[in-house]
């Protein structure tokens, strides 16, 4: 969607400001819930702000040996922005009206693609580890 919209913008005769957005919003918490639900894990969130943590509530996936009640996520102060606006929603109406752009990719589809790809990567990492090889982490 994003690349398609950029291409459409480049086809216009005059430069203008454009908002590339779906007009929908989701919380980080709901995004995390979607990701874990994709692999059959339900989370329970406790606390607020910097003290918020996620715990394993249930799991229907036998591949993962997850302990019910185990803390698996917590807010990282490095990324927490207490003064952040509560709700951010981009307005794509100009792009829809002037260019006929309508997003085709849903958040659910993105989560599905992302989680499927990450699971394949983690299987590869596990295979290497079990074979006695070290795998480097090039990410934060």
Label every model-predicted segment:
Residues 1-140:
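C-terminal substrate-binding subdomain of Rossmann-fold SDR/epimerase-dehydratase oxidoreductases
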